[in-house]
Amino acid sequence: MPHSDELDAGNVLAVENLNIAFMQDQQKIAAVRNLSFSLQRGETLAIVGESGSGKSVTALALMRLLEQAGGLVQCDKMLLQRRSREVIELSEQNAAQMRHVRGADMAMIFQEPMTSLNPVFTVGEQIAESIRLHQNASREEAMVEAKRMLDQVRIPEAQTILSRYPHQLSGGMRQRVMIAMALSCRPAVLIADEPTTALDVTIQAQILQLIKVLQKEMSMGVIFITHDMGVVAEIADRVLVMYQGEAVETGTVEQIFHAPQHPYTRALLAAVPQLGAMKGLDYPRRFPLISLEHPAKQAPPIEQKTVVDGEPVLRVRNLVTRFPLRSGLLNRVTREVHAVEKVSFDLWPGETLSLVGESGSGKSTTGRALLRLVESQGGEIIFNGQRIDTLSPGKLQALRRDIQFIFQDPYASLDPRQTIGDSIIEPLRVHGLLPGKDAAARVAWLLERVGLLPEHAWRYPHEFSGGQRQRICIARALALNPKVIIADEAVSALDVSIRGQIINLLLDLQRDFGIAYLFISHDMAVVERISHRVAVMYLGQIVEIGPRRAVFENPQHPYTRKLLAAVPVAEPSRQRPQRVLLSDDLPSNIHLRGEEVAAVSLQCVGPGHYVAQPQSEYAFMRR
């Protein structure tokens, strides 16, 4: 039955009275209630809200992916205009018909690329499969198009990436592959569920620009789900604000930002970290927290100095970490990924040193190398006056009491078969620090310290939200009273309010226990808020390092300026200068085996502020 008359002119999607529920303990739990919206051709609708507000399940309902997961979906109308201009009722399509709709007419970019990509197929095969299915292309034509899409999403060495498997790529690289796959068939509607959360600011800016270009070329409608209000201001035409499963406010992006009506919308905007908000301040400052009663209430600032004078707790000198690449009939090592090249820095007790840079710049590898989670090929790592890069495995285990790691994905770093109490107790058992009764009391204290309840110790990881799981990982890292915590993108996937709570918790713990943080992040607004010093990494080397205030208020290196210029601004009407993005020819950190990369030479430009010298910088960036 044709539905053309039911869809208003210009609309590509229309939803009326969408209700979504799930069964839990024989009770129906409502996830979305009476949601209605429309999407015009060529328009971007941003759906914003905190975790659990119903954003993602709405997207899954549109793709008809909820029913097989036990979701109960009811809707008066769910109309889609296909690329052929045929209008269909999505709720009436059977499974076979939806397979032709997904990918060709509606595509979705998921938040977690590792769970969305098939681990047994190469990246090229997975992108080509969609192209062959929906465009009737040959295998050769599909692979050529797959490489073109990888080039479009700014993946260097695209031809090499085609033959790699998902686990061989970084998180940011996998997300770009997902985006390339979704855009490869040029759908009528693109649903993007937190597509740039795991990406650094420059790649995020380029992806947003790419989506805009393709949207204009094809008059594609885009539903953009995000918690980043800077991205909303950057890309959205209209905004739909969701809270506890309901739409509480909708309007143009200018109306939402300049005249928000609902208390939750005002609270959400008040909690957005603004780049430049720390201007003139020397020390870290707490985030404001979302409050419906007091939307603009500011959390108490931290202005006291937490850095302890004396010797650094951690010294790194000329650290080198490379990964071999094999090729040829004999599978010999012919090339190497120069992940970290002659990196040096100090970390003082009570200090937060942030490592920033693009995906693939060597930030995470540097953090992992400090704990010997990856082997280094050169350099020195000195902790409390003792070299740890040459320690035996037995002595290294004892050292790990003092240096702990918080990983980006809390769900992947917690054993799903263990209660969270057992996960927190495990480090205490491994190091033989506390007997069972004392360990249980320690777990209860740690859970309370990170804002959870002692009775939560008996629950499993899947019973917690993302923010709660990250708190559990922090509690586990604190169990051994470490002197240093390495936090690798610990808050990048969390929404605004949860992120603020976690950052405030880290600052409180630093104040109380004098912990030193190596904070690895691509979120420049968060880095500005939490850091004492900042080190900027580019292709495995530090090109600028100094006090946070100096680096943010007076950036000297062109790469640092590019990172700051790429940060989205949560102000839709602000006239921003044209962004300075990286050149189209992205340098590669893959070199022939035995080839040495010229090390940058840093010169002092201010108190504690060092920048790569122009001549070595030029040679390095051109290699």
Curated annotation (Swiss-Prot):
Membrane topology value: Peripheral membrane protein
Enzyme kind, highest EC tier: translocase
This enzyme's EC code(s): 7.4.2.10
GO BP terms: glutathione transmembrane transport
UniProt KW keywords: ATP-binding, Cell inner membrane, Cell membrane, Hydrolase, Membrane, Nucleotide-binding, Repeat, Translocase, Transport
Location(s) in or outside the cell: Cell inner membrane
A cellular component annotation (GO) from this entry: ATP-binding cassette (ABC) transporter complex, substrate-binding subunit-containing
Occurrences of domain ABC transporter (ranges): 15-269, 314-564
Annotated signal sequence range: none
Regulation: Inhibited by verapamil but not by carbonyl cyanide m-chlorophenylhydrazone (CCCP).
GO molecular function, a single term: ATP hydrolysis activity
Recorded catalytic activity of this chain's protein: glutathione(out) + ATP + H2O = glutathione(in) + ADP + phosphate + H(+)
A Pfam family assignment: ABC_tran
UniProt keyword Hydrolase, yes or no: yes
Residues that bind ATP: 49-56, 357-364
Family: Belongs to the ABC transporter superfamily. Glutathione importer (TC 3.A.1.5.11) family.
Subunit (UniProt): The complex is composed of two ATP-binding proteins (GsiA), two transmembrane proteins (GsiC and GsiD) and a solute-binding protein (GsiB).
PANTHER family listed in its UniProt record: GLUTATHIONE IMPORT ATP-BINDING PROTEIN GSIA, TRANSPORT ATP-BINDING PROTEIN
NCBIfam families to which the protein is assigned, alphabetical: PRK10261.1, PRK10419.1, PRK11308.1
Entry function: Part of the ABC transporter complex GsiABCD involved in glutathione import. Responsible for energy coupling to the transport system.
Name listed for the protein in its UniProt record: Glutathione import ATP-binding protein GsiA
UniProt organism field: Escherichia coli (strain K12)
